[in-house]
Design a protein with these regions (language model features):
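Conserved short "hinge" loops at termini or chain/domain junctions
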Residues: 1-58, 97-111
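Short loop/turn elements at secondary-structure junctions
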Residues: 54-111
Length: 111
């Protein structure tokens, strides 16, 4: 599965998050892998005759989407399912996760 793409995104996010004392590279790698799987499902490559190489090339078009979804999911650890969070005067409101997939369109098979 798109290991090169996965590694690139993990490297970038590691640079961004690496100074955080709670940073966990293993969990981040899982979040990136899951984000790639989700984009693959949303694209519905099964409806095409795309080869693995073509799929991987197409996934690079969604690099920023995959990265954003992985980062979103990583940052949601401990607050899963919440749309907002208030604690000690700090207020956070999460965007709807589905918004991150805007622009990812599925292939359809015409019968």
């Amino acid at each position: 599965m798109s290991e090169e793409l996965q590694n690139e995104i993990v490297q970038e996010l590691t640079i961004e998050l690496g100074n955080d004392t709670t940073f966990n590279a293993d969990i981040l790698a899982i979040k990136v892998k899951n984000a790639i799987r989700e984009v693959k499902m949303k694209r519905n490559y099964e409806a095409t005759s795309y080869t693995d190489k073509q799929i991987e090339k197409d996934l690079y078009n969604y690099y920023s989407v995959i990265k954003s979804v992985a980062l979103y999911d990583y940052n949601q650890i401990g607050t899963e399912g919440q749309s907002s969070h208030n604690e000690n005067g700090v207020s956070r409101t999460w965007v709807n996760r589905d918004e991150l997939f805007r622009g990812v369109h599925a292939f359809v098979k015409i019968l």
